[in-house]
Amino acid sequence: MSQEKQVFSIDLAGRQLTVETGQLAKQANGAVLVRYGDTAVLSTATASKEAKNVDFFPLTVNYEERLYAVGKIPGGFIKREGRPSEKAILASRLIDRPIRPLFADGFRNEVQVVSIVMSVDQDCSSEMAAMLGSSLALSISDIPFEGPIAGATVGRINGEFVINPTVEQQEQSDIHLVVAGTKDAINMVEAGADQVPEETMLEAIMFGHDEIKRLIAFQEEIVQAVGKEKSEVKLYEVDADLNQAVREMAEKDMHSAIQVHEKHAREDAINEVKKRVIEHYEAQEADADTLGQVNEILYKIVKEEVRRLITVEKIRPDGRKGDEIRPLASEVGILSRTHGSGLFTRGQTQALSICTLGALGDVQILDGLGVEESKRFMHHYNFPSFSVGETRPMRGPGRREIGHGALGERALEPVIPSEKDFPYTVRLVSEVLESNGSTSQASICGSTLAMMDAGVPLKAPVAGIAMGLVKTGEHYTILSDIQGMEDHLGDMDFKVAGTAHGVTALQMDIKIDGLSREILEEALQQAKVGRVHILNHMLSVIAEPRTELSAYAPKIITMTINPDKIRDVIGPSGKQINKIIEETGVKIDIEQDGTVFISSINQEMNDKAKKIIEDIVREVQVGEIYEGKVKRVEKFGAFVELFSDKDGLVHISELALERVGKVEDVVKIGDVITVKVIEIDKQGRVNLSRKVLLKEEQEKEAAKEENKQEQQ
């Protein structure tokens, strides 16, 4: 590859995309700087010279955010970036998924792909720039990568598809789709949608693939100009004689073990065959490399037989038909003190979801590179080791947990009521209690149940299902509700979530080339049938959201004040609002438009806080009548508190009908008297009169007396 800087350009969605090579990070195997509008991402690819002694392909993909890219200094004492944000983790997964299948089987050299986001233009996606950059860095390097790949974001506005929509366009779009693949096939889809029909989603995927083909042709030109020759790498292979010997020893028993229907019994039967074969070679004092090869051969025997049974004989490991859903069971309200809970069980997969309602001040604050500053709906997914009967250290959420949590969040977000209709922050936590495939979709179903139990007025209930595909030659089988073994050994993992009306989320990963539109269409339609079946089951448990919130959920009341009065409610350095909070124990959130949200478990305290705020912002009007308490007495009159922090003066001449010599002769401190506002002077001082009301009362009495006499 030439070490001189070279620049290549293409138009992408009406904005220029340029690729620079030969100037930055020249010690990496491959490096490119991708500029898209004002977005700039440096992508690099490096690989170890020797293969690693592992039984998998050690690929790491990192998408690194730098806050200088948006002119921010990180918060906290350290003032530097810490652990990756959730968005960065999701972007890393997004890039990893289409790249990983394009390395040869048996390639065991460690590969690291790093994209550093150096400048961000919000209208020009840094994730898409990083995906293109990652593919190009690998493609122009000497690493044996079988790409390139490319990705595109697709939106839909007023029925028209849009490539790489701007921030403004995204707000109008009812589809948020990321599709990636090679020039021949799609191998990754990640999408959120507002109950969009399956046919429309398929059209959007194909629309995105047309753009991908153009971007790949652009990459191929760059590779032709500056690409290095690919390294000759020895791929991991098992010994042919050993392969034959192990197969003769294990195939028959392994085929029988695979057809045991129950998961744990099947695993025990397979492990028994493996143990017998391994012990045979250990007795012959086989070295670690040979034992590793034996394990690899045994794994391939299982994979080949499972795939053959599914595609040729149409037999699934647990005996189900291709479109059959595992037995379903659901329950709500099983945790008394939580705001809402839902238990969803599908075969040997079980998720317990809990819904917690909070005030709007409980929103998650986002400190990243995007324009979004907070979010009021969250879904968190936990996958403890006991869910698969294993022991493992208990650590924080990994990439998988964050990815599954985000998928559930994306699936449910379109049906969450607006802040205006439901002024609560909603947090969902899904605890996976048992796992045998499709746990992310079980968490979506459990979360829907939990929110309905909590009384969240969902626009529509959502269910999710994981579809699979096994393709051998011309034979293929689409599987509904895949379990762990089918996911691991199959060719496609296609998760579809949505309502009875349409799709709200899609996630698809494909391990093979040449997946036709017809197969995708069939998979989507089969998924719809399964999804509706699951929804009907869920609605048989709880038909609609509860009409009342939990007694333990915060009660929220909303009021509107003049925006000019916000500072009066807050007070200097927050003194006034903190006083209200201390006195009532409520939470208070104030929007810039003057909307005030008051929340606490105690409705009485909410009402008290509302009354205090009403008094603070209340405007005194001439002619209004108040019942107030005498707060101070002076020689010239009495000061009366009309409402909180608002006093007026009753001059001595306005205290009574007769002449008053001493104020104390009529009122004293603590007396409650009725007064009328007669004037507000230029300085805002309020002048009151008791005499006016007494005179009015006197005139009424006189009129009554006169009427009485006339009637006599």
Curated annotation (Swiss-Prot):
Cofactor(s) recorded in Swiss-Prot or TrEMBL: Mg(2+)
InterPro entries attached to this UniProt entry: ExoRNase_PH_dom1, ExoRNase_PH_dom2, ExoRNase_PH_dom2_sf, KH_dom, KH_dom_type_1, KH_dom_type_1_sf, NA-bd_OB-fold, PNPase
GO annotation, cellular component aspect: cytosol
Keywords for this protein: Cytoplasm, Magnesium, Metal-binding, Nucleotidyltransferase, RNA-binding, Transferase
Highest taxon of the lineage: Bacteria
A molecular function (GO) term: 3'-5'-RNA exonuclease activity
Places the protein is found: Cytoplasm
EC number per UniProt: 2.7.7.8
Described purpose of this protein according to its UniProt entry: Involved in mRNA degradation. Catalyzes the phosphorolysis of single-stranded polyribonucleotides processively in the 3'- to 5'-direction.
NCBIfam families linked: polynuc_phos (TIGR03591), PRK11824.1 (NF008805)
Listed name of the protein: Polyribonucleotide nucleotidyltransferase
